[in-house]
């Protein structure tokens, strides 16, 4: 549920344990 970054397109979400939801990075 916590936003990890601005957009999953520009940031390596998966490498920091985040997932891409609605074009945004989230973690729990």
Curated annotation (Swiss-Prot):
Belongs to the cyclotide family. Bracelet subfamily. GO terms for biological process: defense response. There is a cross-link at residues 1-28 (Cyclopeptide (Gly-Asn)). This is a cyclic peptide. The presence of a 'disulfide through disulfide knot' structurally defines this protein as a knottin. It comes from Leonia triandra. This is Cyclotide ltri-A. Pfam families: Cyclotide (PF03784). It comes from the Eukaryota. Disulfide bonds join 4-18, 8-20, 13-25. Keywords: Disulfide bond, Plant defense. Probably participates in a plant defense mechanism. SUPFAM superfamilies: Cyclotides (SSF57038).
């Amino acid at each position: 549920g916590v936003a990890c970054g601005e957009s999953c397109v520009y940031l390596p979400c998966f490498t920091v344990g985040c997932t891409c939801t609605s074009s945004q990075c989230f973690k729990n």
